[in-house]
């Protein structure tokens, strides 16, 4: 069973870029593994580092700014997670420490993969995201409160409403991935299998 997501308060980092694709999130040369851990070190590798080995941080990239170290909420622009389909993208984001991504829109496959990996993608309007970017840039180090149960983001003096499909919301709040959902019906599955005839080779 995955970790339950009900509420989260976290430091916000503003990634002021639209159409951030999955190859930027986790470049293809780091996709050899099939486990979910270890990808955070290579998140935004080509932007975070000046060298191919990832040993020389790029001081001009926002994730490397001192005031955003430990950020767990990523604020981005439209069409986040576009490009090729790779579940490694939410793996890298969660392994780095992100719990929430806020943007006006997401690529469909990335959006679905995020829920499967307990990464909450929050859609707000362009105008609301503009407000949040202005707020974060004026207040480096600000924290947002994200309440999945109430479907609200509290930022500064304002509250922003978002909507999540009821089934996905239920799964995240109860820490249920596809395996967890299946295990909820373990008794019924076992009963069905017990009633099936056994075949001999």
From Swiss-Prot:
Protein name, UniProt field: 3-isopropylmalate dehydratase small subunit
Question: Could you tell me the Gene Ontology terms of the biological process aspect for this record?
Answer: L-leucine biosynthetic process
Protein's pathway: Amino-acid biosynthesis; L-leucine biosynthesis; L-leucine from 3-methyl-2-oxobutanoate: step 2/4
Annotated GO molecular function terms are: 3-isopropylmalate dehydratase activity
Cross-referenced Gene3D superfamilies: Aconitase, domain 4 (3.20.19.10)
Q: Which Pfam families match?
A: Aconitase_C
This enzyme catalyses: (2R,3S)-3-isopropylmalate = (2S)-2-isopropylmalate
Source domain of life is Bacteria
Q: What does the subunit comment say?
A: Heterodimer of LeuC and LeuD.
Lineage per the UniProt record: Bacteria, Pseudomonadati, Pseudomonadota, Gammaproteobacteria, Enterobacterales
UniProt record similarity statement: Belongs to the LeuD family. LeuD type 1 subfamily.
Q: What EC number(s) is this enzyme filed under? A: 4.2.1.33
Q: Which InterPro entries match?
A: 3-IsopropMal_deHydase_ssu, Aconitase/3IPM_dehydase_swvl, AconitaseA/IPMdHydase_ssu_swvl, IPMI_Swivel, LeuD
Q: What does this protein do?
A: Catalyzes the isomerization between 2-isopropylmalate and 3-isopropylmalate, via the formation of 2-isopropylmaleate.
HAMAP family in UniProt: LeuD_type1 (MF_01031)
Tell me the PANTHER family matching this sequence.
Answer: 3-ISOPROPYLMALATE DEHYDRATASE SMALL SUBUNIT, 3-ISOPROPYLMALATE DEHYDRATASE SMALL SUBUNIT 2-RELATED-RELATED
List the record's Gene Ontology CC terms alphabetically. Answer: 3-isopropylmalate dehydratase complex
Q: Which SUPFAM superfamilies match?
A: LeuD/IlvD-like (SSF52016)
What keywords is this UniProt entry annotated with? Amino-acid biosynthesis, Branched-chain amino acid biosynthesis, Leucine biosynthesis, Lyase
